[in-house]
Amino acid sequence: DANRYRIGLTNKEGLNVKRFSISNGISPRRIALLNENRLKQAKMITRVVQPFQLQKALEHVIANKGSAGVDGVSIRELRKVFSEKKLQIIEAIKQGNYQVEPILGIEIPKGNGKTRLLGVPTTTERVLQQAVAQNLAPLFEPEFSNYSYGFRPHKNARQAVGQTREYIHSGLNHIVDIDLKNFFDEVDHCLLLNLIYQKVKCKATMQLIRKWLRAPIKINGKLHKRRKGVPQGSPLSPLLSNILLHQLDKEMTRRGHKFVRYADDFSIYCKSHNQAKATRVVIEKFLKNKLKLTINEEQSGIRKPIHFTILGFGFVPTYEKGSKNQYQLIVSEKAWKKLKERLKTITRKTTPATFEERIAKIKEVQRGWLNYFQGTSILGKLRDLDGWLRNRLRYCIWHHWKKPERKRKNLIRLGASQDHAYAWSRTRKGGWAIAQSPILGTTITLQRLRKRGYVSLTELHLQLNPSLCEPPST
């Protein structure tokens, strides 16, 4: 029921407004604009289901790829399936009897050994949610804070890191780092719907959003009810999270705090430890009491820049004469570990892929990672990682040769002596030990790997940073 989310309007004196009038502090022109906006908002669902809006949403979902939901319809099949069901879906939405599909729950590993539950809507639901997001965003986006960088047009993680560095360089080096525990699973539905209703008066749209929020989740074949949280695999989730956490941004702005927020990852920058302590108490109270969110006490704290990381970046002092409170960016240990894990997955011997397919995936990961961390001091660690990665590729080739006789022939073809080739092809050593041995280092050389498409991280880094004059690793 839309009345459940109705919020009373107030005039500039803070008094409730029952009738628009000049005496209540609202001009006739303002009344006309408000009424016009309300009329547009009341008809939002008609815009959501317009053919060009649905087509735009469809193309967006296809471009983002992703896995199938509970109905098993893949991205490849989506265009055909959606065109067949589109008219039926539109009519059901307009009539208010559209039934949403359950969400598929998939557990994905986190860096700390734990798992995160990802809620994946069906591909059809993702198209509809994207269409709603396209119409909701213009209403909320203009009011969002300039210091909110996550999931917003013309905003990105590097801008958030740059703003953080600017704060630190200005002397705000006592950082309140608050970690929200399972934020996406803890979002209060009633609170979120109330915030949306302040801008959206369309009953059908509100009803649709509420159904998506309450859709059950299917985990290991069993359906579970959901009474809070937003599914992380939904196209609507980023916008909904920003709508809720915009209340936090407003509170921090009202109090004059210097902050940076990227989705649910936020930090506040203070001049002194005492100021940081007081700020932490107030903001944690606001999060618990007003937004009904849980704080991860173990991961939260007040930190100095050298003990603080944000979005994969860390900070170290420059130690240059006359550069007090100046820091340079480094890559955090967690980000290095994550890169190595991704490369390890691609080069796992049991992963069914040709050598060329592995190289293509490695290049994609390398370019994305190096572009993101461009401008950091990483050459030394890149060289170590390159040596490890080349051995992983040699291991893949060795495993691909399989039988001892094939291994012997290939080693001879690549320049090994008859005796060495025979001995190594029959060795009892494990594949990883052989990959690091001289026999593969002198046969499957760097030059031969390059001929098959391999490019080292060091070489790519130097291409992206031509000002660095250190020679590439050989």
Regions found by a protein language model. Give the residues of each.
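Non-catalytic, polymerase-adjacent accessory regions of viral genome-replication enzymes
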Residues: D1-S83, L87
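Extended C-terminal regions of large enzymes
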Residues: R392, I397, W401-T474
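Short amphipathic alpha-helical coiled-coil/interface segments
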Residues: F82, K86, I283, D386-L393
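A glycine-rich phosphate-binding loop feature that marks nucleotide/adenosyl-phosphate handling sites
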Residues: Q299-F308, K361-V365, L382-R390, E405-L414
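Conserved polymerase palm-domain catalytic core
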Residues: A92-E107, G111, E143-H307
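Short, solvent-exposed helix-loop connector elements
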Residues: L117, K225-V230, Q328, K344-R358, ...
